[in-house]
Amino acid sequence: MAKLLAKRLGVMYLDTGATYRSLAYAAVQAALNPITDRHRLAILARRLPLILQPTPEGGLRVKLAGTDVTTQIRTEEVSEAAAQVSQYPEIRAAMVALQRRLARQGVVVEGRDTGSVVFPGAPYKFFLDADPDVRARRRQQELERLYGSRPPLAQVREQLHFRDGLDRHRRVGPLVKPAGAIAINTTHRSAAQVVRLILAHIHRRRS
């Protein structure tokens, strides 16, 4: 949805989750343990050779040290590692600084602490949610598109539940509805319908 919105507005799309996934992928490649190698992970976070490039379709190409890792950072192994490394305050501080550098011009930013921590002063903030089963089915379909295989729905639902729990209870940048954000339940709405609703809110604020 954020990609589609950015395309409609004619601005860059930034997925802050991709920065954590990129760090997690680099950590996995370097055989760093997300629990025991905290100090080395923090150093890696501050020096992460990350480039995000917008695609003609409105998406984002992710490059680490010049290598395209757009697909590789979406595996479940990387997702689990990203959930772990994102718990540490020093790593989150490095990632927030990186995200702010990447968004020096007008962008649509997607992320779990975007409106509360990274860009609390953003002029437009939206908090999207959906029924857990619907979220699990959407994630299952995303994994099938990326890798050609469909993991069991129960497994995907459990992974989302685990990730939500970690994010809601972390000490720094927990998952919350940001102050001033408009909540939108997407359970019975398509991506296009949600984008139209968001654009309507933006146009009303501007007029």
Locate each region found by the language model.
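Hydrophobic positions on the alpha1 helix immediately C-terminal to the Walker A/P-loop
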Residues: 1
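N-terminal phosphate/diphosphate-binding loop that engages ATP/GTP or pyrophosphate donors
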Residues: 4-73
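Conserved beta-strand scaffold positions in the cores of enzyme catalytic domains, especially
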Residues: 13, 125-127, 181-184
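Amphipathic alpha-helical transducer elements in NTP-driven molecular machines
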Residues: 20, 38, 42, 88-96, ...
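NTP-dependent small-molecule kinase module
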Residues: 63-70, 137, 141-145, 166-207
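ATP-dependent NMP and nucleoside kinases share a basic, alpha-helical "lid"
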Residues: 70-146
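Anionic, Ser/Thr-rich low-complexity intrinsically disordered regions
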Residues: 113-115, 126-134, 145-159, 164-169, ...
